[in-house]
Amino acid sequence: MKTYVLQALLLTLAVAVVRAANTGIEWPPKPQKCAEGETWKECVGSSCAELTCEHPEPSLGCTYDCNYGCYCAPDFFRNANKECVKKDKCP
């Protein structure tokens, strides 16, 4: 019985690896050129990756997901127009 369960798990893992390899998506993604006030971040939690004009203080807890992309650089805040601006430019 243990042998069958182990074989099933290995087969499932093999199928998942093959599917991931055939998606054409590079992982992890290569760093991209970011807009002014942004910086490329790797494997950051989405809830703590950047501050916003609406929420200028860091949250108490961060998620453990792993995201890649352009996020507001230190001392910049994401505004309603999705731009990273200095604090004095926040409404």
From Swiss-Prot:
Its main location: secreted. Salivary gland. Midgut. The keyword Secreted applies. Residues 1-20 form the signal peptide. Keywords: Disulfide bond, Protease inhibitor, Secreted, Serine protease inhibitor, Signal. One of its GO terms (molecular function) is peptidase inhibitor activity. InterPro entries: Ser_inhib-like_sf (IPR036084), SerProtInhib-TIL_Domain (IPR051368), TIL_dom (IPR002919). It comes from the Eukaryota. Residues 34-90 form the TIL domain. It is found in: Secreted. Disulfide bonds join C34-C70, C43-C66, C48-C62, C53-C90, C72-C84. Belongs to the serine protease inhibitor-like (TIL domain-containing) family. Tight-binding competitive inhibitor of chymotrypsin-like proteases; inhibits host chymase, cathepsin G (CTSG) and chymotrypsin. Inhibits chymase-mediated generation of vasoconstrictor peptides: angiotensin II and endothelin I. Reduces chymase-mediated vascular permeability and vascular endothelial-cadherin degradation. This is Ixochymostatin.
